[in-house]
């Protein structure tokens, strides 16, 4: 895995690790957890933790892995931005959804362009997948906009982020907030 990561073959390294942990005893899984923390692979930690949890084995550290974005200064609470990033991408900065949402915060291109204009930076499609800080900045600015729109209600903000503000408004009208 180290050689794969060092040679830029991140996807193969991640695949190797997720398959390897299927055969490891708990003590070696704990060693793998430390390795993944050292190599700053929180999204692989989440994958390992979820896979083991589905088998009835609990490794809380990887299941609740934190991302370095916790140390950044964003316009919304860290808990909200981390929860959205973990749910949307499992902290994988390279993931693209079937509908085109991209990066750690899974932002749709049109929304990302709008947020880039709002903060005065150039929209760069490539950076959406290669620079998690850029992606997180645009995503958290969008979360801030939604928080202002929905009165900082975390449920409605989360629904709006995932399904769009119109659906969140319809849901709120139908079910109350």
Positions of PLM-derived features:
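Cell-wall glycan-active module
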Residues: 1-156, 163-177
